[in-house]
Amino acid sequence: MTNIIELPEVLANQIAAGEVVERPASVVKELVENAIDAKSSQITVEIEESGLKMIQVTDNGEGMSHEDLPLSLRRHATSKIKSQSDLFRIRTLGFRGEALPSVASISKITIKTATKEVTHGSLLIATGGEIETLEAISTPTGTKIKVENLFYNTPARLKYMKSLQAELAHIVDVVNRLSLAHPEVAFTLISDGRQLTQTSGTGDLRQAIAGIYGLNTTKKMLAISNADLDFEVSGYVSLPELTRANRNYMTILVNGRYIKNFLLNRAILDGYGSKLMVGRFPIVVIDIQIDPYLADVNVHPTKQEVRISKERELMALISTAISESLKEQDLIPDALENLAKSSTRHFSKPEQTQLPLQSRGLYYDPQKNDFFVKESAVSEKIPETDFYFGAVDNSVKVEKAELLPHSEEVIGPSSVKHASRPQNTFTETDHPNLDLKNRQKLSQMLNRLENEEKSVFPELDYFGQMHGTYLFAQGKDGLFIIDQHAAQERVKYEYYRDKIGEVDSSLQQLLVPYLFEFSGSDFINLQEKMALLNEVGIFLEVYGHNTFILREHPIWMKEEEIASGVYEMCDMLLLTNEVSIKTYRAELAIMMSCKRSIKANHSLDDYSARNLLLQLAQCQNPYNCPHGRPVLINFSKADMEKMFRRIQENHTSLRELGKY
């Protein structure tokens, strides 16, 4: 008797499911890709309990014949390749014949399908990979696959599922990526009876982006295009002012397949050059058409890793396309647009309404003279709206938003304000080592800044400036050269840090509420973690599709920083699963000190230079900027005399050393 046996097919499928089906989103991905391969123009995904209870994918594609239906649950049975040569010219999303058998082996699956050539369709029901029912039924052309009780026979996998909201966010992300890859298909995603995503299927990629990321985001994206003999690159990239805190918004498509590729991500960032702030990433959708012979998708069961021949040439093509597109744009922000974005509003006294602050019990020290507290612009709440159906009070004036080509009219109340994300106003050249995304490095920086000891600064006499960058001063210890940007950065950092003080969680109502748009997956994740935002005084309410409304703001947040501040806090929460006023304010102090400091090649008059040195002398640590760079260097009198050889060396000792 041999010790080596051939595993039963059901067991082999369950083993394969460990690689193919990691979570409910994996099932959605495989079923939707099969629907796309079947040349569907409409695909509807319905889920219950984030896919753990039920996943149903309905399409209007080619369907399967009665004879092919049971074969679809056989491992390595496929209609997409027939010979070895086909493996090197794959244009379909699936080809292994593993997905459906793997899914069927760990769930109960029901398939209804019909082709247009026959008068009736077929029904198949299987549990744990074993077919229980196979019969003829009446059903429309296309395929409907229902997966129920996922992982019912693999409890270990079920145990490690994340929360329902987290799993739902993964599903939304998968559907969004596939809808970007195939704008010619109309996608609909419904969760527990509520529609989360819907695309038009017009074939216009820009329309698909608008449906996923929102109209305001799409308006700030540029078309790119480039090609050579092997590759054709097209898509949309965001202006440098529109960024996110992670790479999740960078979508790379190869022949209609969403892939992950570090080198191509690097090429995208290279295309932006120094226009992006360190730790920030653009919103990008790039479609790459390539000869299948140059791409190997048979690398991993999920098929998200693709190996590409001539990868360096493709990187150069992408970088050039992005850089050329950005060159054609005026990257200087529009002053009128910035004025419109300013949340500082002035009203005559009779129009102001003072409401009592709603105390939430945290300590507030008025002796700090907290400059974030304002006596401005508060009002009663606007009329309540039906958030899911967008019913607005008839007394509220509405105005039409600017429309994209072929898009439906978007109407919104003028009594709300669309929040804009913060723009990047300094680059890597200011601080190449500053990475606000690296929470460990940021924490170390903040700890170092908190533990700084008071230093004694020498008395300096300013006498000149070089190249609009360095200040010269003399003191009793010799010559001092000061980096003017680093000096003012230290001064302003300590100013903003001291102004932060203790915070109060009291709230002040907004005269004009703010609307905050997010992608579908981020919107769902934020809903799950909303209690953490509430702890720091940010109370967002659902307001329509992937949108929150803010009706009141914590008084520790300046009114003009509400839009950027709330987005920053939400990004922090999505990135680290926690929010901290202390960390946010410290980050803000560091960034504000850099952005509002004088730069290199800026000439100072004598009065300004002397005033800067006076302010620097009053700092707790005048010797380093917040990022750790030196503010000034010193040449002592002895150093100067050595450089000019006024101090003679001991010639005898040099002879003894064999130098003479």
Curated annotation (Swiss-Prot):
Write out the GO biological process terms. Answer: mismatch repair
Q: Which GO terms describe its molecular function?
A: ATP binding; ATP hydrolysis activity; ATP-dependent DNA damage sensor activity; mismatched DNA binding
Q: Mind telling me which HAMAP family this protein's record contains?
A: DNA_mis_repair
Q: Which family does it belong to?
A: Belongs to the DNA mismatch repair MutL/HexB family.
PANTHER family attached to this UniProt entry: DNA MISMATCH REPAIR PROTEIN MLH, PMS, MUTL, DNA MISMATCH REPAIR PROTEIN MLH1
User: Is this entry keyworded DNA damage?
Assistant: yes
The segments labelled Disordered in the record are: 414-433
Q: What does this protein do?
A: This protein is involved in the repair of mismatches in DNA. It is required for dam-dependent methyl-directed DNA mismatch repair. May act as a 'molecular matchmaker', a protein that promotes the formation of a stable complex between two or more DNA-binding proteins in an ATP-dependent manner without itself being part of a final effector complex.
* Keywords from the UniProt entry: DNA damage, DNA repair
Query: Which gene produces this protein?
Result: mutL
Q: Cellular component per GO?
A: mismatch repair complex
Residue intervals passing through the bilayer: none
- InterPro entries on file: DNA_mismatch_repair_CS, DNA_mismatch_repair_MutL, DNA_mismatch_S5_2-like, HATPase_C_sf, MutL/Mlh/PMS, MutL/Mlh/Pms-like, MutL_C, MutL_C_dimsub
Write down the Gene3D superfamilies for this protein, in alphabetical order. Answer: 3.30.230.10, Histidine kinase-like ATPase, C-terminal domain (3.30.565.10), MutL, C-terminal domain, dimerisation subdomain (3.30.1540.20), MutL, C-terminal domain, regulatory subdomain (3.30.1370.100)
Q: What is this protein called?
A: DNA mismatch repair protein MutL
